Amino acid sequence: MFADIIGDLGKWTEADGRGTMLGGCGYLLPDGSMRGSPISWVLKERMAYLEKQEQDGYPRLAPDFIVELMSVFDDPAYLRRKMDQWIANGVQLAWLIESDPQRVTIYRAGKAAEVLENPTVVRGDGPVAGFELVMARIWG
C-alpha cells in the first residue's frame, strides 16, 4: 500500500513539476510541535525559502499535503487528532487512509472532514489538484 502511494504520487509530482514529495519526513510546525508523516508534499517555492540546513533536516513549515496510513495497530482517535493538528498548523489537504474498513477521510483547511467509504479513486484538490489515487491497487 505504502509503496504504491509513494510511486503514484512521485510520478505525478515529477510530471506536474510544482512540488516536492518527501517520504518519512519530520516537520517543525508553527505551534512548536514536531510531527512526521510517511508521505508529504510541499510546493517547490516554499522549499526554496528554507535554509539548506533545514532542507536537509527538519523543515520549519507545514507541508501542503500529507497522507497518513492507519493500520490495525494504530489508535484511531490519536490519528484523527494528529490530522486535526496538521490542518491547524497550515496543511491544506490531508488524507487518512484505512484499509479495514476501506475508508479515506479527507481533511481540508476550514472545512469539516469528508469520509469516503470504499472509494475507487481519490482526487486531489488545492495544492495537489490533478493528482488521482486509484484505490484498487492500494486496497490490494
Residue spans for each PLM region:
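Gly/Pro/Ser/Thr-rich low-complexity, intrinsically disordered segments predominantly at protein N-termini
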Residues: 1-140
